[in-house]
């Protein structure tokens, strides 16, 4: 199984890990076996099954940062944002300046409609990683949804000065529209169409 895992042959690794688990081959083994099994499942996008393997690893070796990170990822990809946040926050305790963790906590909070709290994480990300466009996108969107239109426009304009995507022009257009600047909105919408090809 480890050989197949090292060669990124996920299906073969999963097959062997499943057989080992069926015959009791994992009994007495370390959490690492369940982590490897979970990782192979995760790579095949079998997130619910990966979560089960990672949870078994957690019972053998509680609060392992690698395991918690992968539980968070799988819960997020399975759209269980509240539980994902729980595991991301465990990782955050051990690595408070991990920019990926900060971003994903903010993103999960935004998915749950907790925009004010999400903003705090996106501002933290912008502080940790100077000129962070993905933080600016989060700030722009959460500000827009929270009716903080001037703040939203400030961040969309910063993005547009750097590396804008079509969606950035579109969102800037939405902000300009609700602020009553139809002329500016139409320019942004036009740029969104051009940028999207």
What do the PLM-derived regions correspond to, one by one?
Residues 25-28, 62, 96, 130, ...:
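Short coil turns that delineate tetratricopeptide repeat
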Residues 177, 182-197:
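TPR/TPR-like (Sel1-like) alpha-helical repeat modules
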Residues 29-32, 66, 100, 134, ...:
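Start-of-helix register in tetratricopeptide repeats
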């Amino acid at each position: 199984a480890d050989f197949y895992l090292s060669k990124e042959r996920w299906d073969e690794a999963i097959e062997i890990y499943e057989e080992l688990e069926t015959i009791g081959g994992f009994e007495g083994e370390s959490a690492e076996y369940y982590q490897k099994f979970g990782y192979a499942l995760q790579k095949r996008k079998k997130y619910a099954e990966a979560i089960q393997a990672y949870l078994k690893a957690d019972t053998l070796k509680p609060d392992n940062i690698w395991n918690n990170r992968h539980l968070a990822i799988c819960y997020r990809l399975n759209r269980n944002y509240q539980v994902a946040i729980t595991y991301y926050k465990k990782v955050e305790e051990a690595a408070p300046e991990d920019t990926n963790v900060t971003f994903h906590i903010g993103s999960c909070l935004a998915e749950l409609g907790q925009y004010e709290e999400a903003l705090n994480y996106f501002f933290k990300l912008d502080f940790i990683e100077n000129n962070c466009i993905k933080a600016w996108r989060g700030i722009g969107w959460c500000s827009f949804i929270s009716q903080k239109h001037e703040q939203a426009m400030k961040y969309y304009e910063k993005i547009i000065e750097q590396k804008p995507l079509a969606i950035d022009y579109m969102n800037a257009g939405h902000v300009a529209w609700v602020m009553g600047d139809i002329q500016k909105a139409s320019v942004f919408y036009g740029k969104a169409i051009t940028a999207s090809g």
